[in-house]
Regions:
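Anionic N-terminal interaction surfaces
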Residues: 1-34
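Acidic, Ser/Thr- and proline-rich intrinsically disordered linker/docking segments
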Residues: 2-3, 55-127
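Acidic-enriched, low-complexity/disordered segments with a strong bias for Aspartate over Glutamate
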Residues: 9, 13-15, 20, 51-54, ...
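A generic structural signal for short, solvent-exposed coil/turn residues
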Residues: 22-24, 29-31, 40-42, 73, ...
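Phosphoinositide-binding peripheral membrane targeting modules
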Residues: 29, 33-69
Length: 127
């Protein structure tokens, strides 16, 4: 498995990432380890160290499912992570239960990370 920075450019130790990844809890396309969040991609795994995270929250998007006129919206839960650099990352979760759990764990592991959505100031774009 190849580990790469999810965003930005910083050195990674493949062996320590692999050890943390194998102990991490799978929550969908996101895993939470002791030191980082891991985002699954087709041919690689993105690493996002918790010390780069400023805020985390859940987002629910309605995704149309079905064919033709029988399309109905289905809610998909995402973990949204805003970084200190201003960038944002999004990873799909299995459901609300995993989302609530990961937010509690992130806060327990790194109390300086803000939890919950904060509306942007007037005139600013939402992440």
């Amino acid at each position: 498995m190849k580990f790469k920075p999810e965003t930005g450019d910083f050195p990674l130790d493949q062996d320590s990432c692999k050890a943390d990844y194998t102990r991490a809890r799978e929550l969908g396309r996101v895993r939470l380890g002791q030191r980082a969040l891991y985002f699954s991609h087709l041919t690689w795994t993105g690493v996002l160290p918790l010390d780069q995270v400023e805020r985390a929250y859940l987002r629910i998007e309605d995704i149309p499912v079905g064919m033709g006129c029988r399309r109905v919206p289905m809610g998909q839960h995402y973990l949204m992570v805003l970084l200190r650099s201003g960038a944002a990352c999004k990873g799909a979760l299995n459901g609300r239960k995993e989302g609530d759990w990961v937010l509690k764990q992130i806060h327990a592991q790194a109390p300086d990370i803000k939890i919950g959505y904060e509306a942007p100031a007037p005139g600013e774009a939402a992440p």
